[in-house]
Amino acid sequence: FQQGIFVAEEIAGLAPRVIDEKAIPRVTYCEPEVASVGYTEEQAKEKWGADNVESYEYNLGGNGKSQILGTAGFVKLVRTKNGGPIVGVHMVGARVGEQIGEAQLIFSWEATPEDVAPLIHAHPTQNEALGEAHLALAGKPLHAHA
């Protein structure tokens, strides 16, 4: 709906803030769900160079709620190297569309894994997977499985 607000404000002459299309969350409602925001790893490498991008894929096998639900999937984080921010979050799994709001904030606020890692995520929830992925990319893996 932000695009509609943009158009209405533009027509009204209010000089609205330009919408960052990369910051619009994308969700495919299927089983399992697919959700993402920001750049894919390939897009990030094209924009910042392959040597300046790193990623981490957290397997939902390490997430207690996913084990309870009997579901599988992953959370993939893409960041720029040398302390750079998260530039993409990609998730596959049951109910991941419900997590994309936090991922959108992380991307839009240019948060680093080190910014997100100390934040507490409720247990047991699938949302913990987003926190665990940031812990791992920040060099502090907890329930990460290779």
Name the predicted role of every residue range.
Residues G13-R17, I24, Y29-A146:
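Flexible, glycine-rich terminal cap/loop adjacent to redox cofactors
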Residues F1:
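Acidic, glycine-rich loop-and-beta core segments that form the ion-binding/anion-interacting portion
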